[in-house]
């Protein structure tokens, strides 16, 4: 206690006089006791200068820190539950043990040690280490221990961040050290010609540059969506500033090169403005979005190019003085690019809706290309000299409609978009009809030369889809993208209008014109996500299932090729059934894709990665086939047949796709993208075959055999598929499948009955004894858990006060 009263008078005097110091800038310093780091703030100019003299070695006497404890954490000292009052902090020389202790100990017993408001802390066995610099946003200290760091390292945490300020001019190397906090710090190297990049309030990427003597600049990215790359060779370039909005972005620029390159990261964006000597300042108008507009210099003779941005995220990169107009896009939400050389074109404005999109147009070129990015969309209206203005009607969606000029003699083509995300690209005055689509939800293409056709309207439903129509060509092509769908209705001259009935689903029904008085083909979609493409007046029939895919129809189909996209399934059936025996495919509850090329010597079936499809064929002389379902979700399909009775399908609430072609010898295909579809066929000469389901997702298919007994199917709790073949002279053939993904390929019209499975494991049926082993294992784990809890409770009861036997300290109080 004698030492307590011998606390140096200088401490008391300095503390009591702290209120008279003049406040100016704020500074942050790190104080260490061994490996424990503590950060305190100074707001008095005299104290700040004193601390800096301690760091530089000019002050060697008053080097220890004392300050009043405030029992709550603060953002710049996030590692501890207390901090020092900035106004009370000062420096002293002598050593006293009463208020000296490690930070960790004080942090653990702060409530007992500081019961009053006048609790001081004077850790004399520590040392002042360095000064830290902060920005104006939420952040914390980022510091790492590096003694001889030639490489400047930046370590980021998990939050939005700000710019850290440079250390004083005395220290050319700026070291940054990080705590385990939510923060990122960006710092800059002094003696490099590299142009600075200022980051805003965003999630970023850490850039680490090699030492200044290394000509090659390396970029190290962190774990965020962004990369800031700085390019060298800025020797003669003008000052390049980066103005940031409230965005996420990376802008990389090479300025004094003939080729104007833009390097983007994988991020949202930033606003960049360049000064150009011979041009007016390029303005950037932002709406409610996060974006970036980059304007390139050398606009010497170009007209004023304004970019009006809507509610989107984009990056605009422009190369203006090149013959080839190049656009470099990254992996970002988009950019509106307008090209110069608008010498004779009218004013081209961009009207944006509530979308995210990129529209790039080259206007006075022979070829009218449209480049789209990976985005949702924007509304663009172009002025057309001769036709009337094309109006655009939007639904509840984000979309883009692009209309091309020079519609000299074509009729007005209206697009009514619904609740979709799409991009419509039209190239009208070209002999070759080109469509460029990106990685978007869809693309609606209407071709010109509708001189002899009625008005073609597009009615979209509550779907996402892509409908491409080529009307004045012999080949009826339908190109689909990887999307959900839309309802399309076409007017047919002679037949009545084909109605479309939708369920609760997102779908697309495409109807083609029937030129030759064919009967109307009706499609009743259920609760599915599907795309039905019908080419009616063509020899080739194309049937798709409930998939994400792309069907491309070829013109002079000697060889029947099928182009699949990135889909879950594609069912293709080819015509030319010279020997029209019934081709049946019975898939189970598998993930598959069935493609059929029928008029080839080799019958190939390619399957993909989908759930299943039940296919039942109609037999002329059979009665109606009922369908019994269990716990599944299904759909209703009804088709009218002239020469047959009505085929009813009783479905539940499932997701499926049913495609039917009625007036052909080929039997229909019923597929679903569903947990299951149970289809039962009746044979008038045999009793009805029943279907038994388990708790699984499956499909049981039973075939009637005249000379054999019924083939039984036993399922476990797995996903499986039972395939049964009719063999008159053979015994019953059973297939037991396990929890696999399989493919069943059947070629029926050959002498040899083959069943080929692709990439599956066969006969993985978990048997009864395996279930018993699992149940025994669960019982054993339950007993072990009960024993552990009992022992833990006994230990706690024997040691109730173990955590209270700690030492406390006495802190001096003023």
From Swiss-Prot:
Region annotated 26 X tandem repeats, chain positions: 149-757
Coiled-coil stretches: 754-787
Cross-referenced PANTHER family: CALMODULIN-BINDING PROTEIN CAM-BP15-RELATED, CYCLIC AMP-INDUCIBLE PROTEIN BP74-RELATED
Induction pattern: By cAMP.
Full protein name: Cyclic AMP-inducible protein BP74
Position of the signal peptide: 1-24
Keyword presence, Repeat: yes
InterPro entries, per the entry: BP74_N (IPR056422), cAMP-inducible_BP74-like (IPR053344)
Keywords in alphabetical order: Coiled coil, Repeat, Signal
Keyword Signal (UniProt): yes
Lineage of the species this protein comes from: Eukaryota, Amoebozoa, Evosea, Eumycetozoa, Dictyostelia
Pfam families: BP74_N
